[in-house]
Amino acid sequence: MTQVPGVGRHRIAVPHQAEPLSLVSQDGIALAAMHLPNPSSSTAIVVAHGFGGAHDQERVERIAQLLNEESSVVAVTQRGHGDSGGMTTLGHREPMDVEAAVAWAREAGYDRVVTVGFSMGAAVVLRHAALLGPGSSDAVVAVSGPAYWFYRGTTPMRWLHRGISTPAGRAYIRTALGTRVDPEPWPDPPPMPPTEAAARVREHGIDLLIVHGDADGFFPLDHPRALHEAGPGSELWIEPGFGHAEGAIEEELVRRIGTWAMQGAGRGASPELSG
């Protein structure tokens, strides 16, 4: 095992087959990433973590390894997180980070690229595909993502908004999570909301899978249902007992997502778990 340098108690040793990558976003942010090749696959899955994550965080790397059983994987640490530069803009500029990983995969020769995002990363992969259209992603998977910006309807989200909105809160987040939050406010009007992004993804003819747990403590079920309704032809899996994002997802569900990513819409779902 090769140790990847970095701060944070959740970093782990990356397996020998992982190839460390140094990417640069369109606006010049240095991004840490890794490539897990699968010689039998011409598909690459790009993994976008949630707020506070990183590509070498244990729970993210576990997901990447499971997806790597069927496909190659490119996992990117988004700006303001881990060893990447810059500050997080909470989904505003992060589509450029995903595009850096997608572009690398295309240049590496992969025929298909599927983006899989968790929580904040779910909103990011939706906006990435919506903004860039056909030729960006061949399919999109949004796991535990929000449908609306500025949501404060649950206790965790109220605490998060309090944290990111004050200097003391941002300092605490940096100390506790190693995540640097940009103090600049979002533009007015704000970026394209996830529901509009889901609609555009489907208008572009890009396959879209929305995955959400009925035990999610951050975003209740009106969020995935709104995304599904906004994107006609999207697929919705409501997963019994699943909590929120990378920290709660079971291996079996990750493998089903990997199967869907490899085979397309309508594959990998269990009827009793699909909605």
Where are these regions (language model features)?
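Hydrolase active-site cap/lid region
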Residues: 134-187
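Alpha/beta-hydrolase active-site loop
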Residues: 89-108
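Short beta-strand/loop motif that positions the catalytic acidic residue
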Residues: 201-204, 210-212
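Catalytic histidine-centered segment of alpha/beta-hydrolase-like enzymes
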Residues: 242-254
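An N-terminal hydrophobic leader/cap segment in hydrolases
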Residues: 1-24, 29-38, 246
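Conserved strand-to-loop "acid loop" that flanks and positions the catalytic carboxylate
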Residues: 209-215, 240
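Conserved alpha/beta-hydrolase
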Residues: 64-85
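The serine-hydrolase catalytic nucleophile loop
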Residues: 51-64, 78
